[in-house]
Design a protein with these regions (language model features):
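Residue-level signature for tetratricopeptide repeat
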Residues: 93, 127, 158-160, 195
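Structural motif corresponding to the intra-repeat A-B loop/turn of tetratricopeptide repeats
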Residues: 97-98, 131, 164, 199
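Alpha-helical segment of the N-proximal tetratricopeptide repeat
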Residues: 75-112, 123
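Basic Arg/Gly/Lys-rich low-complexity intrinsically disordered segments
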Residues: 1-74, 78, 85
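Structural register within alpha-helical repeat arrays
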Residues: 90, 123-124, 157, 192, ...
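Solenoid-like repeat scaffolds
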Residues: 74-79, 108-115, 142-149, 176-184, ...
Length: 221
């Protein structure tokens, strides 16, 4: 190739001073590869990699889970079943110790591994709720309801709506809710009273709280 004056431009030679050095003799390359292999072998066997996610405390036993949860986890491969079960127990321990953020990390990892298991989504909803992550909790509780048809989470769904600043929507969620479980009924009344108070309906909120207290007393007798 020539420049404007017709002088030739020669391609630079490939040599030690350039990026592409001269090829090494075959024997030398072979010896270097053998040395590298020997060095790798001298390192010994690799240690097994640690599982992703938060470290599970010592002593956690998935057998502590409710039998219904254990039954759900049987749909998973055995190694994953044990890991997810331990994560759920660790989350429960963390909540008992008022370590809500740690509990959330455990259930987040459980959801990553087994997001199609209803009890896992339920656990993640509860830990999200305990961390005031109401939008996330709402999404999880709705997913559980779609998966199982279980309405027992309705009071928590309504309370999430309250947490998001939507008391009227919370009241709509509770409208027509008639749980058979007295404890869930009381929870719904308390959440409804809070929503009434948020909406400025303080007298109605007080009446609902009195009713909840009376119901609680009757249950204790």
């Amino acid at each position: 190739m020539t420049n404007g004056s017709g002088a030739s431009q020669q391609r630079p030679a490939r040599g030690p001073g350039n990026r592409r050095s001269q090829p090494q003799p075959r024997d030398k390359r072979h010896n270097e590869k053998s040395t590298h292999r020997d060095q790798r072998n001298d390192r010994g066997p690799r240690e097994p990699s640690q599982p992703r996610g938060p470290r599970i405390p010592d002593g956690v036993d998935p057998a502590e889970l409710d039998p219904s949860v254990i039954n759900e986890l049987r749909t998973l491969p055995e190694d994953m079943r044990d890991r997810v079960g331990c994560l759920l127990v660790a989350a429960e321990w963390a909540l008992e110790d008022d370590e809500a953020e740690s509990a959330l990390e455990f259930t987040k990892e459980a959801k990553r591994l087994a997001g199609r298991v209803a009890s896992v989504r339920e656990a993640h909803g509860i830990t999200s709720y305990r961390n005031a992550r109401y939008a996330d909790a709402l999404s999880e509780f709705r997913a559980v309801r779609r998966m199982t048809g279980d309405d027992s989470f309705i009071p928590m769904v309504a309370d999430c709506e309250r947490g998001l600043g939507r008391p009227e929507r919370a009241l709509d969620v509770l409208k027509g809710f008639r749980p058979s479980d007295p404890a869930v009924k009381i929870e719904a009344i308390i959440v409804g009273a809070g929503a009434r108070g948020d909406a400025g309906q303080h007298a109605a909120a007080l009446v609902m709280l009195v009713f909840a207290m009376a119901t609680s007393v009757l249950m204790a007798q």
